[in-house]
Curated annotation (Swiss-Prot):
Species whose genome carries this gene: Arabidopsis thaliana
GO cellular component: membrane
Gene: SRF6
Compartment annotation: Membrane
Ranges of compositional bias, category Polar residues: 332-354, 708-719
Extracellular side: 30-293
Tissue expression from the record: Expressed in seedlings, roots, stems, leaves, flowers and siliques.
Record-given protein name: Protein STRUBBELIG-RECEPTOR FAMILY 6
Length: 719
């Protein structure tokens, strides 16, 4: 009987405890109060399910984005939820167990709070609208390892004291308006591996970074001056858009103390004493040089003079026996005195052999010609008197790729007239070229910023590699020109222009892409990327996936243009990083480095364009809708919201299930974390299944430009 009463009592206690848990909550009271205040500061957004402005139980009720350990809140992750308002920060320091706070990619603004959770290890406030200076309160978060304030509206001098933040490994202040020199306390960041300061207005030198264990540094597009410390030259460094000195660094001014721990410090005392002793010895050691020393100098001069005379007599005698052909036979390499025309001998074209001229006997020398740096430019004065050894290129371009002259391309493009200008991209302008035989091609003039004039051999090698790409959805390279310092590539021409023009031009005609055609374009582009990523060996990272580089033929089949160009141009990464059109993956914006996964992200953005008809970044829209990814991503799994974001040009004519599955593929491709993005082969499979199901329940009404020409648009075209 007693045992039964014990069981009843225990059961009663459990019930009472359970009820008390709901009365008092499972969450620490101070944590709950802090989250209530934060919720109010963000205007009580509906997307934060379970959250309340008063009381509640964040841990017990599973508030969205909140992670707990026991009764304490340890993580808050609310990235990309279109949150607005401020941080309501006067209670944040109560979250003493919080180790991660991620509010990135929202519309939060105002100044940063005066106090932050004291034990944060990761703080991400990137891609918001925060203003003012970076709060000094960040100086007190000593456990901090990751801090990202990039893509905000901060300005002025950085007010943070970094002397206590020696655990910090990643720091991102990029794309703000910070000014003045870097804080001296940067030198205390002894664990810092990655630093992103690009696109600000910092000035002064970067000497304070010299002693840090950095592996990645991006300081592009600031006002830095001075010299790059030698310790930074062996890391991943992006520094364009500054005014750094390119010459050797000057020696330290007189009186500058030597670097701590350097050998010169150890010997300095002895040198100083020697100098002092010589001064104290008086005039006896300043009066002159001894007789023995004078005799030694005279004998040395006589020996050197005799050797010089003998050398010149020998050279003169030998030069009389030399014929002009002796010079040409040296090392079996032809060379000549250069005129104003520079002839280059490439094995890819038999007609481009080097002219060999006989040298005048009076100018003949029998010295082995020095190797010529192909990157070196010769001015007119040098080129009229110095022999130039021309390097032979051993790269062979496929025979079906034609070598054009500049004159040929000038005639075909009307001297590269504006009337024939098709577009302008990151690496140069593209012109329509019509040849005498009626053939129409597209000619791209590669800017010298992308490929300097002296790098013709590199250009030939690049052409050879791109010419070997062979896929029906990759624009074919059919010719090239390397003449007079110009580098041009010639592609097949597609009269319907680019996908960008179809989607974003105001003319009604450009809005006629029906749903099936959009899926067809997505699938064809995916197959092109699958070829580059998984068929080519080694894999090719395109780096420049965007709607402007997807050309459409008369049947609206997509052709990926400029494929491989960015992978082989030496300055491609730097040029691409200077312009962010909304296609760049988050990791590219942070590090400037491209990968197969960043290509997949960019492809996801193109799919969003096909879905919504919007540009990846549109400054004419409201702030919350300027970034297509940030605006669209939270709505991709909500069928009602999805229907509202579809391109109005479709006029509601699309299969709802097809639309939903299309959105699912997009969501996978634009995952913030690259490891969660699928390989292109899986993307292709998903789109193929989408097409197959569309064939069974086809619901497409509309007229494509191809249909106006008399050809029917059928889903079988993109099977």
């Amino acid at each position: 009987m007693r045992e039964n009463w014990a069981v009843v009592a225990l059961f009663t206690l459990c019930i009472v405890g359970f009820e008390l848990r709901f009365i008092h909550g499972a969450t620490d009271a101070s944590d709950t109060s802090a989250l209530n205040t934060l919720f109010s500061g963000m205007h009580s957004p509906a997307q934060l399910t379970q959250w309340t402005a008063a009381a509640g139980d964040p841990c017990g009720q599973n508030w969205r984005g909140v992670t707990c350990s026991g009764s304490r809140v340890t993580q808050i992750k609310l990235s990309g939820l279109e949150l607005s308002g401020t941080l309501g920060g006067y209670m944040l320091d109560k979250l003493t167990s919080l180790t991660e706070l991620d509010l990135s990619s929202n519309n939060l603004g105002g100044d940063l709070p005066y106090q932050f959770p004291p034990n944060l290890q990761r703080l991400n406030l990137a891609n918001n609208q925060f203003t003012g200076a970076a709060s000094y309160s960040l100086s007190q978060i000593t456990p901090l390892k990751y801090l990202n304030l990039g893509h905000n509206q901060f300005k002025g001098q950085i007010a943070i004291d970094f002397s206590k933040l020696d655990s910090l490994t990643t720091l991102d202040f990029s794309f703000n308006s910070f000014t003045n020199s870097l804080p001296a306390t940067f030198s205390s960041l002894t664990s810092l591996k990655s630093l992103y300061l690009q696109n600000n207005q910092f000035s002064g030198t970067v000497d304070v970074l010299a002693g840090l264990p950095l592996e990645t540094l991006n300081i592009a597009n600031n006002d830095f001056t001075g010299w790059i410390p030698s310790s930074l030259k062996g890391i991943t460094l992006i520094k364009d858009g500054n005014s750094f000195n390119t010459g050797p660094a000057p020696p330290p001014p007189p009186g500058t103390p030597p670097i701590r721990g350097s050998p010169s410090r150890k010997s300095g005392g002895r040198e100083s004493r020697s100098s002092d002793e010589s001064t104290r010895n008086g005039d006896s050691k300043k009066s002159g040089i001894g007789a023995g020393a004078i005799a030694g100098i005279i004998i040395s001069l006589l020996v050197v003079t005799a050797l010089l005379v003998a050398f010149f007599l020998f050279r003169r005698k030998k030069s009389k026996r030399s014929s002009p052909m002796d010079i040409e036979k040296t090392d079996n390499q032809p060379f000549t005195l250069a005129s104003n025309d520079f002839h280059e001998n490439n094995s890819i074209q038999s007609s481009s052999s080097v002219e060999t001229k006989k040298l005048d006997t009076s100018l003949s020398i029998n010295l082995r010609p020095p190797p010529i740096d192909r990157n070196k430019s010769f001015d007119d004065e040098d080129s009229t008197r110095k022999p130039i050894a021309v390097k032979k290129s051993t790269v062979v371009v496929p025979s079906n790729v034609r070598l054009y002259s500049v004159a040929d391309l000038q005639i075909a493009t009307g001297s590269f007239s504006v009337d024939n200008l098709l577009g302008e991209g990151t690496f140069g302008r593209v012109y329509r070229a019509e040849f005498d035989d009626g053939k129409v091609l597209a000619v791209k003039k590669i800017d010298s910023s992308a490929l300097p004039h002296g790098m013709t051999d590199d250009f030939i090698e690049m052409v050879s590699k791109i010419a070997n790409l062979d896929h029906p959805n990759v624009t074919k390279l059919v010719g090239y020109c390397a003449e007079h310092g110009q580098h041009l590539v010639v592609y097949e021409f597609h009269k319907n222009g680019s996908l960008h023009d179809f989607l974003h031009l105001s003319e009604e005609e450009s809005k006629a892409l029906v749903w099936n055609s959009r899926v067809k374009i997505a699938l064809g582009t995916a197959r092109a990327l699958e070829y580059l990523h998984e068929v080519c060996s080694p894999s090719i990272v395109d780096k420049n996936i965007k709607s402007a580089n997807i050309l459409l033929d008369s049947e609206l089949n997509p052709h990926l243009s400029d494929s491989g160009l960015a992978s082989f141009l030496p300055t491609a990464n730097e040029l691409l990083n200077q312009t962010d059109e909304g296609y760049s993956a988050p990791e590219v914006s942070m590090s400037g480095q491209y990968s197969l996964k960043s290509d997949i992200y960019s492809f996801g953005v193109v799919m969003l364009e096909l879905l919504t008809g919007r540009k990846p970044f549109d400054s004419t829209r409201s702030r919350s809708e300027q970034s297509l990814v940030r605006w669209a991503t939270p709505q991709l799994h909500d069928i009602d919201a999805l229907a509202k974001m579809v391109d109005p040009a479709l006029k509601g004519l699309y299969p709802v299930k097809s639309l939903s599955r299309f959105a699912d593929v997009i969501a996978l491709c634009v995952q913030p974390e690259p490891e969660f993005r699928p390989p292109m082969s899986e993307v292709v499979q998903a789109l193929v299944v989408l097409v197959q199901r569309a064939n069974m329940s086809k619901r497409t009404v509309g007229v494509d430009p191809s249909q106006r020409a008399g050809s029917a648009d059928t889903t079988s075209d993109y099977m």
